[in-house]
């Protein structure tokens, strides 16, 4: 039957020796009151810089991984075509109707008025969408970085 030792015990079984645990840069810990403040795990395992960083910034790392996961989900969902109904493609010489189901009256109206707007929409609307997408991509990055920095700042 094993006898439990108190935390302030300085016997050879409680203290790690360099023969049984060869650790680079290990310093001999004298038996003192500071040893009673450490846990047995802290006596055995030396402090690791990476572990300290992970402990200090755990929520910031989780938040950044969550933001990356949301960004990847956005990329995936934006790559899936959302047009399930009929739509049309027109070239200068032909007009083709694609899709499932009955043809939408709006599609027919867009085909009849293709001289006014060759691709079924106003060129100004397409330009506005491209300008907005150019402006919103850096803003989302700035928002994500500021959110990461806000979470990683120590209180």
From Swiss-Prot:
Residue numbers on the Cytoplasmic membrane side: 1-59, 152-155
Location(s) in or outside the cell: Host cell junction, Host plasmodesma; Host endoplasmic reticulum membrane; Host cytoplasm, Host cytoskeleton
Top-rank taxon: Viruses
Motif stretch (Involved in plasmodesmata targeting and virus cell-to-cell movement): 89-93
Keywords linked to the UniProt accession: Host cell junction, Host cytoplasm, Host cytoskeleton, Host endoplasmic reticulum, Host membrane, Membrane, Phosphoprotein, Transmembrane, Transmembrane helix, Transport, Viral movement protein
Entry GO terms, CC: host cell endoplasmic reticulum membrane; host cell plasmodesma; host cytoskeleton; membrane
Region (Required for attachment to the host plasmodesmata-associated membrane compartments): 150-155
Assembly and binders: Interacts with movement proteins TGB1 and TGB2. TGB1-TGB3-TGB2 complex formation is enhanced by ATP hydrolysis.
Family: Belongs to the virgaviridae TGB3 movement protein family.
Name under which the protein is recorded: Movement protein TGB3
Source organism of this protein record: Barley stripe mosaic virus
């Amino acid at each position: 039957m094993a006898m439990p030792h108190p935390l302030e015990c300085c016997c050879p079984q409680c203290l790690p020796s360099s023969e049984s645990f060869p650790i680079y840069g290990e310093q001999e810990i004298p038996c003192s009151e500071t040893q009673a403040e450490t846990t047995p795990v802290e006596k055995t395992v030396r402090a690791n810089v990476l572990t300290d960083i992970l402990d200090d910034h755990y929520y910031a790392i989780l938040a950044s991984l969550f933001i990356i996961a949301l960004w990847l989900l956005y990329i995936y969902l934006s790559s899936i075509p959302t047009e399930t109904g009929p739509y049309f493609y027109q070239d200068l010489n032909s007009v083709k109707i694609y899709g499932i189901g009955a043809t939408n009256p709006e599609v027919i109206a867009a085909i009849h008025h293709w001289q006014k707007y060759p691709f079924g929409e106003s060129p100004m609307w397409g330009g506005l969408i491209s300008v907005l997408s150019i402006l919103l991509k850096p803003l989302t990055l700035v928002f994500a970085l500021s959110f990461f920095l806000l979470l990683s700042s120590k209180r």
